């Protein structure tokens, strides 16, 4: 095939990323080798898996390996593998663009502080681009397994905005990356001892042979190769043999994270079912956590043979932040994603892994509450999806939930349902909560007025997932979760007989006003009634017990969902001066304006959106003019 060479532009974000890495990650520059070896190992894993269906892919070179070489005279370090390789389109997709979500958010969060930015960059995942931390030019030669030699591809760039692509003959499959080191890096990195120490530090656990040339006469690399890592599956070793540092390095390998994990669980299960799991909980949420199109899951091995990344069937979506591996002895080597669906072995491993993770979190919450709070701040909103997805573990998940509450009146979500139960008032038989589109909207909601006056704690829920959560978590330890903004407020034994009688008298006295407002508002409301939850506000909106909060209805409508309209109930406080003013209004037209204004204000306070904002403003202006003059 005739060679064809063209110059192409990097995706804009890569340009920025390259410059940031060179400056922010320089203090930990040796991670470039970890990242390149990790990618090479993944390429070999993928070839091993594809070869299960097509053994011819391994023809002529069945021993999968990674080689690290260096040339002091040329000033280069080479990392090569005989894995799956890439074709031209894959090179453009994997090297010329960033396929991850959250790119824009990533750049918005950069602060200019090198230490903080280094952590963010690592959290985003640097991968191949880390080569430019130490190199001023990088060449990549690759050919995909199963393609002819003439379909080789050469990619080359100096990291300044463009790269070249060239077609060439490559006799061997796999990928070779050549780093042309910056002048100032050569003395430090171009030695066998230095490179081996980096490999032993970061990549000892990779279950694949990493080879370097044996050192010959004069300290120069010879012609023979030797394995320089342990090349054993870390998860198969006994826990007592593995140091915390080894666990942390393995986490970085399996997650492509830059920092340490928050905690981990390593288990060997024996009996009717045999498998090993090594599961990590990250300390920081990845940028693609909320990207539903991005695959999430853990690595699946069968008898130490890599089968697939992102095996979503092994953990439910509400635990998608977990990283790690599961190695089974009870699955066939030719297992596919289709076979994983409804597989008994998979179901049992999934169930065991879920219980292990939830147990790990419970132990952390009990023994290390500050550490658990760190976890909650990063992943709490994801865990809130659990009761709706995993009915069998709903109670255990509920014990792990944390909320803001009127007990502290801060937006910190650190109140558990058990904490709430321990503080319940005498005679209280419900767990009260309110949902809103922001913490301040929840905290300042008029629906809380009576409960605050009585000293009854209310959970303040302002995450978008909270409406979903409460619809799937009706009770906790026998106490019903009850919204103070939906249905009639029943305080049960908390209310005295005198209070009930006073309410009945207020209702009777306000019958005429209620009927008049109801007639004025017509079809805009389900009904109008006297409120027993207001003490200082003139009115509030109350929804049906099964209705969705107004702000959630609005969000779903904006997203294009068909939402059936529900009419709110308007509750009024007849003792409020504004209601006294309305009641004394003799002009029916002006009374209707006051009533509409009362409803509009209540809708806004509830987080709803007015159908006619201009009409609302006009009514305010008219009433202000009337009062002024």
Swiss-Prot record:
<dbReference type="InterPro" id="IPR019805">
    <property type="entry name" value="Heat_shock_protein_90_CS"/>
</dbReference>
<dbReference type="Pfam" id="PF00183">
    <property type="entry name" value="HSP90"/>
</dbReference>
<dbReference type="GO" id="GO:0016887">
    <property type="term" value="F:ATP hydrolysis activity"/>
</dbReference>
<feature type="region of interest" description="C">
    <location>
        <begin position="555"/>
        <end position="629"/>
    </location>
</feature>
<keyword id="KW-0067">ATP-binding</keyword>
<feature type="region of interest" description="B">
    <location>
        <begin position="338"/>
        <end position="554"/>
    </location>
</feature>
<protein>
    <recommendedName>
        <fullName>Chaperone protein HtpG</fullName>
    </recommendedName>
</protein>
<comment type="function">
    <text>Molecular chaperone. Has ATPase activity.</text>
</comment>
<dbReference type="InterPro" id="IPR036890">
    <property type="entry name" value="HATPase_C_sf"/>
</dbReference>
<keyword id="KW-0346">Stress response</keyword>
<dbReference type="GO" id="GO:0051082">
    <property type="term" value="F:unfolded protein binding"/>
</dbReference>
<dbReference type="Pfam" id="PF13589">
    <property type="entry name" value="HATPase_c_3"/>
</dbReference>
<dbReference type="GO" id="GO:0005524">
    <property type="term" value="F:ATP binding"/>
</dbReference>
<dbReference type="GO" id="GO:0005737">
    <property type="term" value="C:cytoplasm"/>
</dbReference>
<comment type="similarity">
    <text>Belongs to the heat shock protein 90 family.</text>
</comment>
<dbReference type="InterPro" id="IPR037196">
    <property type="entry name" value="HSP90_C"/>
</dbReference>
<comment type="subunit">
    <text>Homodimer.</text>
</comment>
<dbReference type="InterPro" id="IPR020568">
    <property type="entry name" value="Ribosomal_Su5_D2-typ_SF"/>
</dbReference>
<dbReference type="GO" id="GO:0140662">
    <property type="term" value="F:ATP-dependent protein folding chaperone"/>
</dbReference>
<keyword id="KW-0963">Cytoplasm</keyword>
<feature type="region of interest" description="A; substrate-binding">
    <location>
        <begin position="1"/>
        <end position="337"/>
    </location>
</feature>
<dbReference type="InterPro" id="IPR001404">
    <property type="entry name" value="Hsp90_fam"/>
</dbReference>
<dbReference type="InterPro" id="IPR020575">
    <property type="entry name" value="Hsp90_N"/>
</dbReference>
<keyword id="KW-0143">Chaperone</keyword>
<keyword id="KW-0547">Nucleotide-binding</keyword>
